[in-house]
């Protein structure tokens, strides 16, 4: 809005500019921010912000966050971590002297579970945790599991 249209322009020449008697409109009459939340602003806080004051629950002093962090991956999705051109090479049988190495931690997974089917191609899997079913299926395919910390 242009300055020439503002209300303060219309108040020029009138002593208190619409703020009452001289000296009445002061800076922060109720305090700044949340001041007086338990005193003169209590009714507002009780109505619109219940539970703002006080404590809830107990503290956990030495809390270890992500203590049981173990994102899972099923073996049916295991080969999706191998690049497409390399996957074709291994599954077709062109590369028989080497096996792909999949490090689950570097892909953001910690635990390998055994849901799904696996192509009968040897594979080396590095993971923190491996279920018994996943271990059995990988070994049947001629693969190896390396547990890493």
From Swiss-Prot:
Compartments, as annotated in UniProt: Cytoplasm
Ribosomal protein among keywords: yes
Record's protein name: Large ribosomal subunit protein uL15
Job of this protein: Component of the ribosome, a large ribonucleoprotein complex responsible for the synthesis of proteins in the cell. The small ribosomal subunit (SSU) binds messenger RNAs (mRNAs) and translates the encoded message by selecting cognate aminoacyl-transfer RNA (tRNA) molecules. The large subunit (LSU) contains the ribosomal catalytic site termed the peptidyl transferase center (PTC), which catalyzes the formation of peptide bonds, thereby polymerizing the amino acids delivered by tRNAs into a polypeptide chain.
Biased composition (Basic residues): 1-14, 21-30
InterPro entries reported in the protein's UniProt record: Ribosomal_uL15 (IPR030878), Ribosomal_uL15/eL18 (IPR021131), Ribosomal_uL15/eL18_sf (IPR036227), Ribosomal_uL15_CS (IPR001196)
Chief location bin: cytoplasm
SUPFAM superfamilies named among the record's database cross-references: Ribosomal proteins L15p and L18e
Protein's UniProt keywords contain Ribosomal protein: yes
MF-aspect GO terms: RNA binding; structural constituent of ribosome
Region spans: Disordered: 1-43
Assembly description: Component of the large ribosomal subunit (LSU). Mature N.crassa ribosomes consist of a small (40S) and a large (60S) subunit. The 40S small subunit contains 1 molecule of ribosomal RNA (18S rRNA) and at least 32 different proteins. The large 60S subunit contains 3 rRNA molecules (26S, 5.8S and 5S rRNA) and at least 42 different proteins.
Alphabetically ordered keywords of this record: Cytoplasm, Ribonucleoprotein, Ribosomal protein
GO process annotations (BP): translation
